[in-house]
Amino acid sequence: MLCNRLHKAAFAARLRPRLPATVASCRQVHNSDGTISEKRIRNIGILAHIDAGKTTTTERMLYYSGRTDMLGEVKLGNTVTDFLQQERERGITICSAAVSFNWKEYRINLLDTPGHIDFTMEVEQSLGAVDGTVIILDGSAGVEAQTVTVWGQADRHRLPRLVFVNKMDKESADFDACLEDLEKKLSTVPVPLQMPIKEAGKLVGVIDVLSASQIIWDSKGKGRSYKAIPISDEQLHDQVQEKLYELIDLLSGMDDNLAQAIIEANSLENVKLNLVLDALRNCTLKQQIVPVLLGSSYKNVGVQLLMDSVLNFLPAPSERNQIYDLTNSQARIEGDFINVSTFRNDFVGKVFKVTHDKQRGPITMIRAFRGTVKKGSKFITATGGSETIQRIYEPLADEYREIESFGAGNIGLCAGPKSTVTGDLLLLASKLGLQTTIPDAVYFCSIEPPSSGQQSALDNALREIQREDPSLRVRYDEVTGQTVLGGMGQLHLEIVKSRILTEYRIDADLGPLQIAYKETLDEPCRGEWRAEKEIAGSKQSVYMDMTIHPSTASESNEERIVLDNSAEAQETLKLVRPRQMTFFRKGALAALQRGPKLGGQLANCTIKLHALTIGKGTADPFIMAASAQCIGNILANARCRLLEPDMFLEIVTPSEYLPPILADLSRRRARIEDVAPRGSANKVVTVIAPLAELGDYSTVLRTISSGTASVSMEPNGHSPLNESDEAQAMRRALGLE
């Protein structure tokens, strides 16, 4: 490689004196200047596995920036971003929260997101509003199950990221093991920019690889001040030099400008530090590398350098727009990526969160991609609704400070919109279609008010919560006459019940928790349906013929309904108007939401339409109803089977408890994927197991391991049940055992 041929010592000598001997507190008075340049804005999301330290890190950022006057603590329940009563009681983040603060003449808009898998929808929506992310790892645990999940979400949104290895004050923390985890489990290229400094087993600072300096924090001043000192230990100095050479060597193979500068200089002696920093930034924005920093937020070490790295290595909104901008000339949506260039200077924004305030009503959190939002601004949603902005507030969790406007690249809280839903696209231009991906529910249960007189209030509460959280499914069961909730997990549904009680004063009753089974066909099934009726003197008539096939195709709604392309079928189908076909599709897709066995969603199936004849004057709703009736009739005579939800588990346990844990898993129909060492005393077991067998697993695991093992789990698709297990599942679901 290039670097191995050049003079290393001279370059290292140029880097060492870059930092001053003492770095004073960098706390600033917050300034809400709305005219800040887009180049000086950073929109970031904080992502992590549960309990890795997201909220604690956020609290330090707010404190050191001068946005708050005290350090909030999760265990004391006084943090800014965990403001819900349920969050403070449980010590976890449930809803994403937005905060803005200034740091070194830059504006940082930060979203603190949940780490629990039940609230993954909060993370998904937040990522559509940010330009980069900070992934936080627990230094003693490395890459955990939910880390993999949020990393994948960031990949789907094409977000550049930094990694902050937190909790490095713990005795079991291992920075090198975390780097290895990042490389092996996430298939990324981690670039460590720091090394830990410990004294008497305590983390006191970090070694900055680029400047070859030690950064030491003042433990008595809540980490507000820190100083940079030269490295006096020769062996350590050589080790840092080697890390520096490895870094430049890696970057020179990715960045042409840096490689060319090294070749032209024929020596590292004349290569400027800013070229190395530029290469780091460019490679980070292209997602070729992931810079890795370390510290301990709780012990007030390393947070200011993390904030500096957010400014130095994560993109400004204008830089992210180069990723959002697509190459074609027409406005379109590709996943969650908005072609903002099509709209010129017209306003384009996205709703990433809706909350309800008792005094102000619905509060819509909007990320502006283009244009400016002012009081009185009118816009349309991608689905065609019209909205007006009445008031605009600056984000600071659940506090509100009114401002006049906010522009491209910024985040604002808006009062006035009445019908916007989390995930909506907002435009001052032509309508676009935008479909938010909502994960399937894995549990469901009935919900009832304490009296029939409160049913209307309960329905209203559920509508408001569903606006905030589209992953909550609400439907009315015509057979039982009950309202049924679907959620991402037991905790998700418990939080919904708790919010209904604390925020709406309704002591609702949740029924027994049921598993959300899906259903599928064993073999193709064909049927026809003729519906005729006279409504208000007008004759309504529809005839249709279709086959429902088992399929492994995508679950996209467009691909679940296909037309027979034979000449005979096309003769009748070509007479169907596009609007009539739209209502046929609506009825068909609605019918596929309820299977014949347990009323579960039909999965892995495709409808092929052979014939559709619609009488003159037939109303669109009649077509939709006939479509649903035809499919219901076909499914009633079809051979179907149940699909049960599976979970991916990651269990961390001391080695001595491994045998009884594996024995217990085997009784739960679990499939052991891997058993790997973690450190010298622990094992990590990765497992796929049916959700139906995991109802009491956390409690049993604690008992088996005397409280020393931990488990995290996340959905892992569905798999078919054999006849015996299906019969047992149906008996459980019907309350027969």
From Swiss-Prot:
SMART domains according to UniProt: EFG_C, EFG_IV
Gene Ontology CC: one annotated term: mitochondrion
Primary localisation category: mitochondrion
Biological process annotations from GO: mitochondrial translation; ribosome disassembly
Domain tr-type G as annotated: residue spans: 39-318
PROSITE patterns linked: G_TR_1, G_TR_2
Binding site for GTP: 48-55, 112-116, 166-169
Pfam family membership, one: GTP_EFTU
UniProt entry keywords in alphabetical sequence: GTP-binding, Mitochondrion, Nucleotide-binding, Protein biosynthesis, Transit peptide
Localisation: Mitochondrion
Transit peptide boundaries: 1-36
GO molecular function: GTP binding; GTPase activity
Role this protein plays: Mitochondrial GTPase that mediates the disassembly of ribosomes from messenger RNA at the termination of mitochondrial protein biosynthesis. Not involved in the GTP-dependent ribosomal translocation step during translation elongation.
Family designation: Belongs to the TRAFAC class translation factor GTPase superfamily. Classic translation factor GTPase family. EF-G/EF-2 subfamily.
NCBIfam families, A to Z: small_GTP
Protein name: Ribosome-releasing factor 2, mitochondrial
Native organism: Anopheles gambiae (African malaria mosquito)
